[in-house]
A protein has these predicted regions:
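Conserved core of the PLP fold type I
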Residues: 105-238, 250-262
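General small-molecule cofactor/ligand-binding pocket signal
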Residues: 139, 180-184, 269, 355, ...
Length: 407
């Protein structure tokens, strides 16, 4: 964490703990420099960060004032934590992109497949995820949803197989595009019934299977390595494409690999966005395609979207090339692992024994006892009905303990 982020967190804690109330004036920049032993630039960046998070506001020729009230008696609550976003680094990269905007002209191929510089920068990143491919197999997209939409248009003729529950927007795409489908249950522990999966593949009715292999959304679990190998083997045997959504690849530690790692026959289409490690507004995704699908995919993308936001592509290129992405990712993984350990401890200390915890994702069946106990902690669980394409979905609930500030 940068020094300005540490200072921002200290000041934020003063607000959250009630030591600074709404309307209170913060110490002057000079006083903060003396109090915390940092330079003026660090203080200004910390204040800018707090302003962007709407904790404080500036009054011209007067100073900075607290914008938010803090309820010191408030129990842990679910709210996004933006303190670790590399806003300043991204701003620097964006300004550099803006300065060179007149030179950002893409070739016809780049308009379809993405900026060459960005693809080159992401090749080693993909290898860290366990994805090995040629440059020609990569296409930059405007986020995951665009990639999924194109794939659903491209691979037609048969039904698609959806794991359930799954990414809500994939359910919406399939429903609104009126694509024929069947479902298979993704188990709460992260696994899947491989016997049933083979029966479905062997029927010859499916062209595509959509799955989230690691850190499943919404359940949180991951396939075992043996399960991944078997799924890829079945896809190869029965000529079914797998669309592997690996949106949380950045948070994987150890030797866990994606399905794509085991694919020797070009059956796995790897889809990755960077919103989970950065923020959704970035709208940059990457797809790794079997060679026979690259040209038709890129052509359809160009029909929809002449070129994915060039400024954002250049900004992200600089962010990766300058080592900022790698540094930020390591910080986020370290933070996530710490929160996972704290989440497990908090769950036990709070007396919750129902459900399953994967990382920070706690999934459980609804009960009045759990609901009542959650109210004591001012927690509102998320009902997972939107993650099912059928209205007759099982009643599962989730709490993302990573978003509890006290964790």
């Amino acid at each position: 964490m940068y020094q300005y982020q540490q200072l921002a967190q200290l000041l934020k804690n003063e607000i959250l703990n009630g030591n600074l109330q709404k309307g209170d004036k913060l110490p002057s920049i000079r006083d903060l420099v003396e109090q915390y032993g940092v330079n003026k630039d660090t203080v200004q960046r910390a204040l800018r960060s707090l302003k962007e998070e709407s904790f404080i506001y500036a009054v011209k020729k007067s100073g900075y004032y607290v914008l938010k009230n803090a309820d010191v008696n408030k129990e842990p609550s679910l709210e996004g934590d933006y303190s670790q976003l590399p806003i300043e680094d991204l701003r620097i990269c964006f300004n550099q992109s803006l300065a060179s905007a007149k030179d950002l002209r893409l070739s016809k191929k780049e308009q379809a497949s993405g900026m060459n510089e960005l693809i080159d920068a992401l090749m080693p990143v993909l290898e860290e995820y366990g994805v090995y491919a040629t440059k020609e197999q990569l296409v930059i997209t405007t986020g995951t949803q665009q990639a999924l939409y194109i794939l659903l248009q491209l691979i037609q003729g048969k039904k698609i197989l959806l794991e359930q529950p799954t990414y809500a927007r994939m359910n919406e795409l399939v429903r609104h595009l009126e694509i024929p489908y069947e479902t298979i249950t993704r188990q709460i522990d992260g696994g899947i019934d491989l016997v049933h999966l083979e029966e479905l593949f062997a029927s010859g009715e499916f062209s595509l299977f959509y799955t989230i292999s690691r850190f499943h959304n919404p359940l949180g679990g991951s396939y075992s390595e043996a399960t991944k190998k078997k799924i890829v083997e079945l896809a190869s045997r029965y000529s079914v494409y797998i669309v592997e959504d690996d949106y949380m690849a950045d948070f994987v530690e150890g030797n866990a690999t994606p399905l794509h790692y085991y694919d020797m026959d070009g059956r796995v289409i790897y889809v990755k966005s960077f919103s989970s490690i950065l923020f959704a507004a970035l709208k940059i995704g990457i797809v790794v395609l079997p060679k026979e699908l690259v040209e038709p995919f890129a052509m359809r993308k160009q029909w929809m979207d002449y070129d994915s936001n060039v400024m954002m592509q250049k900004t992200f290129t600089l962010f990766v090339e300058n080592g900022m992405f790698d540094k930020h990712r390591k910080e986020m993984v370290e933070s996530y692992m710490a929160k996972s350990k704290h989440a497990k401890r908090w769950l036990l200390d709070s007396g919750f024994h129902d459900g399953t915890l994967h990382g920070t994702q706690w999934v459980f069946e609804h009960s009045k006892q759990v609901e009542q106990k959650l109210k004591e902690y001012n927690l509102v669980p998320e009902k997972l009905d939107e993650y099912y394409i059928s209205k007759k979905a099982p009643i599962l609930y989730r709490v993302d303990l990573a978003k509890i500030r006290e964790i």
